[in-house]
Structures are given as C-alpha cells and as structure tokens.
C-alpha cells in the first residue's frame, strides 16, 4: 500500500530536511532489516546518524470478523480445522508495537550501545512462502497475487488476512534459525564453548 510508512513519518516532520528513507516490508524481520540499513549507512560514512523505527499495527487484520465471509464460504471447516488454525495462530503470535533508535558515529554523553555487526539473511530461495498477505496458493502450488484476482474473491477467500504456513514453520523455523546463528558466529569468530 502507498505511501510507505517511512514516507508518512517523514511527512509529519515539517522542520526536517530532505533525507534518504527506506521502508522494508514484512512482519517478522522488517525492523531488523531497517536497523541493518541504518547501521551500514552510518558505518560506511554515508550518513553521520540515522533513526531506525519499527511500527506494527496488525491487530485490526487479525480480528475474527475479517474471516467471516471465508468461513461462511468454506463448508469444510468442521472436517478440516487447520484452515481456521492457520489464521488464528497469528492472532496469538503477533501484537502491535512501535519503537525507534538513534544510531550515530559518535557515542552519546550518557549510556551508549555499540553495534559490532548485524547479519540478516533470507531463505526464500530454499523454502516456500511461510507467511503471506494478499496471496492465494492455488491447487497446483502456484501463488496468485490479489492484483490478479476478482475483487469479489478478496473477501470470500480472506485474501488480505495474514496467513502463516504452520507446517513449514514447524519443520524449518528452528533449523534455519540455528543454522543462521551458527554461520554468523563462525563468520564473526564468536565461540561460546
């Protein structure tokens, strides 16, 4: 959706200057990607400081009434409760929140934290889509964007509801997290033994 959250925040700062902005999208890692971008900008000398902010307001998208039309349209809910669980799971896992941090090439007079490195990677080349919004998985395994669907199907199929592939998360979530941590520790010569 447009404009980006970052652009809207910058638009509210009427006394500020034109600045570089970035709006990573996603749920789980977007704030970490923003922090990495700010860190690399300051580290490289491109900027002297950067403000990293993260803000999530997903609760309006997780209310049960968002799924009512789909539940009415799907007669198999009783025989296949996984359909409901796939979406209801997220109602318990995601929450609203916001925060920000100022990164600078100089320590502050008070308490300062130092970032030595940030490692963020994607496994999208190896794994199927794990979390989605605005997509529909077809019977053949293809993904269809809401832009290619009829508007009448958007609500009956809860296209804009956030969906989590619980099976994929259960199978690979811990494995890929541990692999990434191990690779990062090796790269940065951290030994916890």
Predicted regions and their residues:
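Short, flexible, mixed-charge acidic loops at enzyme active sites
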Residues: 3-10, 66-70, 130-135
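Conserved beta-strand-centric core segments of catalytic alpha/beta enzyme folds
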Residues: 32-121
């Amino acid at each position: 959706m447009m404009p980006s959250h970052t652009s809207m925040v910058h638009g509210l700062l009427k006394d500020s200057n034109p600045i570089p902005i970035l709006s990573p999208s996603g749920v789980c890692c977007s704030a970490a990607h923003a922090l990495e971008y700010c860190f690399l900008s300051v580290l490289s000398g491109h900027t002297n400081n950067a403000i990293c902010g993260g803000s999530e307001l997903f609760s309006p998208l997780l209310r049960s009434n968002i799924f009512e039309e789909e539940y009415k349209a799907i007669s198999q809910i009783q025989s296949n409760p996984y359909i409901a669980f796939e979406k209801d799971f997220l109602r318990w896992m995601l929450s609203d929140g916001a925060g920000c941090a100022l990164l600078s090439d100089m320590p502050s007079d008070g308490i300062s934290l130092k970032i030595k490195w940030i490692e963020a990677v994607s496994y999208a080349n190896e794994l199927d889509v794990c979390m989605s919004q605005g997509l529909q998985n077809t019977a053949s395994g293809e993904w269809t964007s809401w832009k290619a669907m009829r508007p009448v199907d958007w609500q009956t199929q809860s296209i804009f509801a956030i969906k989590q592939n619980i099976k994929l998360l259960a199978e690979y979530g811990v494995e890929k997290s541990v692999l990434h941590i191990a690779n990062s520790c090796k790269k940065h010569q951290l030994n916890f033994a």
